Regions:
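Short pre-active-site segment immediately N-terminal to redox-active cysteine/selenocysteine motifs
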Residues: 17-18, 25-28, 71
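CheY-like receiver
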Residues: 12-13, 63-66, 100
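Structural micro-motif
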Residues: 61, 67-76
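Structural cue for short, hydrophobic secondary-structure segments
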Residues: 23-25, 77
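Non-catalytic, surface beta->alpha helical segment in thiol-disulfide oxidoreductase systems
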Residues: 77-107
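The canonical Cys-X-X-Cys-His
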Residues: 29-32, 75
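Thiol-based oxidoreductase modules, predominantly thioredoxin-like and allied folds used
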Residues: 5, 24, 36-43, 47-62
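A short beta-strand-turn-helix
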Residues: 3-19
Length: 107
């Protein structure tokens, strides 16, 4: 299961030393809801190696504004406390998402 990320805990999670992926989503977003099971499945598969978390843009807002999230779902990838060039937007296949996780781990 993916971790819940909020404005209050985001900086600490990003700075944790582990690679981090943040899923910016909302309950009314069909593609976001379709990605939910994939995100949760990959969070379990990569547990201990990558932190995968969900950030609800309707309940929070500062982190989304800081990273200029204009559409959802958007997935940002962080390593060593810094945002990487890896980014996914829109609905993605499990295989595509997993390939990006492997790319993050290889950085």
């Amino acid at each position: 299961m993916a971790l819940t990320i909020t404005d209050a805990n985001a900086k600490e999670i990003i700075a944790s030393g582990k690679p981090v992926i943040i899923d910016f989503w909302a309950t009314w977003c069909g593609p976001c809801m379709a990605m939910g099971p994939i995100v949760d499945d990959l969070a379990a598969e990569y547990e201990g190696r990558v932190v995968i978390g969900k950030y609800n843009v309707d309940e929070e807002g500062d982190l989304a504004a800081e990273h200029r999230i204009m559409s959802i779902p958007t997935f940002l990838f962080f390593k060593n406390g810094e945002k990487t060039a890896i980014r996914l937007a829109g609905s993605q296949s499990r295989e595509t998402f997993k390939a990006k996780i492997e790319e993050l781990l290889a950085l």
